[in-house]
Amino acid sequence: AGTKEWLNKAKDFIKEKGLGMLSAAANAALN
């Protein structure tokens, strides 16, 4: 259970960072 919780947290973290990188790329493309 502990490992599953850690994996879920890691997935959420990567998802948030991925969205941030997409936003940064979109802003760079628009500028």
UniProtKB/Swiss-Prot annotation:
This is M-poneritoxin-Nc3b. Keywords: Antibiotic, Antimicrobial, Membrane, Secreted, Target cell membrane, Target membrane, Toxin. One of its GO terms (biological process) is defense response to bacterium. It comes from Neoponera commutata (Large hunting ant). InterPro entries: Poneritoxin. Changing T3W: Moderate increase in anthelmintic, insecticidal and cytotoxic activities. Gain of activity in causing an increase in intracellular calcium concentration on neuronal cell line but no change on epithelial cell lines. Pfam families: Ponericin (PF07442). Expressed by the venom gland. Changing G20E: No or weak change in anthelmintic, insecticidal, cytotoxic and hemolytic activities, and no change in intracellular calcium concentration on neuronal and epithelial cell lines. GO terms for cellular component: extracellular region; membrane; other organism cell membrane. Membrane-perturbating peptide with a few moderate activities. It is insecticidal, since it induces reversible paralysis in insects (L.cuprina) after 1 hour, but fails to kill them. It is also antiparasitic, since it moderately inhibits the larval development of the major pathogenic nematode of ruminants (H.contortus, IC(50)=23.2 uM) and reduces the motility of adult males of the other nematode B.malayi. It does not show antibacterial activity (MIC>40 uM). It is not cytotoxic to HEK293 cells and does not induce hemolysis in human erythrocytes. One of its GO terms (molecular function) is toxin activity. Its main location: secreted.
